[in-house]
Structure formats: structure tokens, C-alpha cells
Amino acid sequence: MDFNLSREHQLVRKMMAEFTENEVKPIAAETDKTSQYPRENIEKLFNLGVMGMCVPKEYGGAGADPLASAICIEELSMQCASTGDIVATHNGLCCDPIITHGTEAQKAKYLPMLTKGHKVGAFCLTESDAGSDAAKGQTEAKLDGDHYVLNGSKIFITNGYVADVFVVFAMTDKSKGTRGISAFIVESSFPGFSVGKHEEKMGLHGSPTAEIVFTDCIVPKENLLGQEGKGFKIAMQTLDGGRIGIAAQALGIAEGAMEEAMAYTKGRVQFGKPISKFQNTQFTFADMAMRSEAGRLLTYQAAVLKGEGKRFTKEAAMAKLFCSEHAMLTTTKALQMFGGYGYTKDYPLERMMRDAKITEIYEGTSEIQRVVISGNIGL
């Protein structure tokens, strides 16, 4: 059992730490304030090979493993969780299911678009009445000759109004429940595709979230991803992998908050000494550091298992649950150390705290993670 990162993974961390410090950190506050999609930085991440980094080299990707991807998301999210979210969604929720379930023709067409072609990807599962209970989805896909016709809508879609390629789930046979759900690769240029409401969110203001609407949307038959009726299984497998990305994002948020709080408390003098010298402050930081190390081990373990082709459902759920709750707790305690200043926008803690909350909700709430974990330990 080797807990040391390989040289390649160390280089990935170094590259992303430098990029985050030089490119992401300087615009993070403005990105949050204006709710602007960080387009220039995403283009730079395409050029660095981070977008679609786990795509095999023969399709234009870097051929990296899930651990490398998690490290990238962790580093980005230390300064801008929105950027980490955009990357995590593109890599884990769009590229990954095409890599895993796509035909050779689908991979040859879409994976180069999602890497060298600088096309952004998204994932369409959630509906207004189908959140945690994904099987309640009402979006329908009816086969009509050489194409499917999709009707319905999806909500809370990350990358929604900037993405070009979407992995979409729809009912092809409502009588079969989860076995009647199928997956499709849908382009934003397809007839009948449109973007609806742009969501105004509590946090992740730089992450473009929107409603996606299908009105007699024409999808070529060859864009069926996997087999008819296998969509629910594809969705659940994809979310397993996506949870590693959210765990890494949450871990990064927590680490960023801890760094900000440590720097502040070393310089903030009260009662004749820096508040970092008070034992209660030190104990709080000790707990933060301990939880970060535990979260990192859980996240990296899940990523390594995924990379080895082993079952990782339980481990991914544990990592996502632990790290998201760690992020919320750490940002709350870090903000408290800033006192009144922490409640202002002069410091990044209030943004980090707002960003942290969603990690307990999306890609499976904390409650759903506990359901997954309990179901995988023999209960």
C-alpha cells in the first residue's frame, strides 16, 4: 500500500496549483460577483489538456486516470469552486459515459469534439419532479424511423447554456419503470433543442446552470448511448464516478477556506497576540487538517479503484458524503474566525461557504449517499 503520489500525479498537482494561483484566483471574486462563465480560463484548461483529460489519447485526450482528474478538480476548487464544477461535469458526467458506453463511431465523433474541439459537455438527468427519485422522469423519447423524437425538460443542468454536447436520459417505455429509461447523446444544434431558464443560485455563480427543453427534438438513432432500457444503469454508474469529482471539489473548497483562515488568524491580533496563538483556534485548525486528510484518503481511494476497473460505488459515496460535510463545516468555522469581516464580501469566506452547500445536494444528497452506503454494507 503506497500512499505517495506518483511523479506524474505530483506534476499534475504542481501544474494545476500554478494555474490556479496565476489564472483562477485573480478572477474568482469577480466571477462570483458578475456570475460570468470563466470562458477564457476554460479555454486555457482545454489547451492544457484538463478538459477531457481521461479521454484516451487516440480520441484527443490526455489518457490520464481518475486520480489525476480528482487532483485537478481539488486544486481548482481551492480558489474557484465554479471552475472546478465546470471541469468535473465535463469530464465525469459527459466524457466518461461516452468513453464507457459509447460505440466506436460515437467515441470517434464526440470525444475529439470534447477535447481538441473545445466543445463543452453536460449531463441531463434531473427534472422538476425527478430529483433524488430519478426514475420519475417524464422526458420521453419515441423512435420514428431513423431518429428519436424527444419531448420534455431537464432542470439544474450544469454547463447548461454553454455546453455543446449533452448526455440526456429519457423514457423510451414508461411501462417498464427504470428499465424503460434510455440514454442519448444530444447536440445543442439539434432541431427542437433549446435552453430555458438560467438559474440564479446561492453559490457557484460562475457555473452556468440552466433548464434544457426538448420540443420534438430530433436525435439520430445512432445517438442512442448503450442499449434501449439501459439508461438508468448508465446514469447510476456515471454518478458513481461523478461523486469522486464532487468529493474533490468539496475537499478543495475546505482546503482553500482553511488556508485563508490560517493566514488571517496569524495576522489578526486580539488581546495582545495573534488569534492563531489561542488554543481554541489551534484545536479548530487541527480538526480541519485531520478531516482534510481523511477526506483526501477516501477520495483518492475511490479514484484509484475506478482507475483499476474495480467496484467503487460505496467508496465514492463515502468520499462525497464526508468531503461535502467537511466543506460545509470547515467554511462555517473558518468564516467564524474572521468575525464580522467574514460576513462581508471583502474576504472570500462567504463565497466559499455558499459554494460548499451545493456539494451536500447535487449528484446525490447526503441522505442519498447514506442510502447508497448502507445498501453496500449488507443492510
Give short role names for the model-derived ranges.
Residues 1-89, 101-106, 113-118, 131-134, ...:
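Alpha-helical interface subdomain recognition
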Residues 49, 73-77, 170, 186-191, ...:
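Short Ser/Thr-interspersed hydrophobic loop/turn segments at strand-loop and sheet-helix junctions
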Residues 64-65, 133-135, 159-164, 177-180, ...:
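Short glycine/proline-enriched turns and hinge-like loops at secondary-structure junctions
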Residues 117-125:
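A short, Trp-centered hydrophobic/proline-enriched beta-strand micro-motif
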Residues 122, 138-140, 147, 165-169, ...:
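Conserved hydrophobic/aromatic beta-strand scaffold that supports enzyme active sites
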Residues 147, 151-195:
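A short core secondary-structure module
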